[in-house]
């Protein structure tokens, strides 16, 4: 799943740790780790929150485009 790598790359590009993103999403670090590794499916509400936070489109995170354009 390509989006798993995108989640990790976006987080690491901002020098953030999993615990930082977990806090943003209102979840725990172990739970967020499961999203990044594909053990658990990322809820749509979290996908939208992450797209807004990283200022990219949900399509970019999902690997449907390489265009990061963000439209609030």
Regions found by a protein language model. Name each.
Residues 1-5, 69-72:
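A detector for short, charged/polar N-terminal pre-domain segments
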Residues 26-41:
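Recognition helix of helix-turn-helix/homeodomain-like DNA-binding domains
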Residues 5-24, 49:
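Short basic helix-loop element that most often maps to the first helix and adjoining turn
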Residues 7, 21-22, 32-35, 61:
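Conserved hydrophobic/aromatic packing and binding residues within compact polymer-binding modules
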Residues 36, 54, 65:
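DNA major-groove recognition helix of helix-turn-helix
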Residues 13, 62-72:
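Short, charged recognition helix plus adjacent turn
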Residues 26, 45-60:
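DNA major-groove recognition helix of helix-turn-helix/homeodomain DNA-binding modules
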């Amino acid at each position: 799943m390509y989006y798993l790598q995108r989640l990790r790359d976006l987080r690491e590009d901002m020098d953030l740790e999993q615990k930082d993103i977990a806090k943003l999403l209102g979840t725990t670090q172990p739970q967020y780790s499961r999203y990044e590794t594909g053990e658990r499916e990322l809820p749509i509400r979290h996908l939208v929150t992450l797209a807004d936070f990283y200022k990219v489109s949900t399509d970019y995170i999902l690997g449907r485009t390489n265009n990061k354009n963000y439209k609030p």
